[in-house]
UniProtKB/Swiss-Prot annotation:
This is NAD(P)H-quinone oxidoreductase subunit 4L, chloroplastic. InterPro entries: NADH_UbQ_OxRdtase_chain4L/K, NUOK/Mnh_C1-like. GO terms for biological process: ATP synthesis coupled electron transport; photosynthesis, light reaction. One of its GO terms (molecular function) is quinone binding.
Amino acid sequence: MMLEHVLVLSAYLFSIGIYGLITSRNMVRALMCLELILNAVNINLVTFSDFFDNRQLKGNIFSIFVIAIAAAEAAIGLAIVSSIYRNRKSTRINQSNLLNK
């Protein structure tokens, strides 16, 4: 696959993730958009690692590290969303003012 095609795909994923993160009012949707952004970054890491040096796997290893961090972030984020939903009965971002009881 050509480098330009993969970079365009990654740019589309990143743009969709940023747009969803900006316009999202639901916490779960915002977390999903954040994961989409991280996956676009992973695609770039693997693509540039393969394009510049096939013998070294630095981009692939760093991508696996980012996936592990993203999994931990998703687990913690969903736990926080679950806790907020139990207390506030809503997952909307604008209704979850934690400073006001």
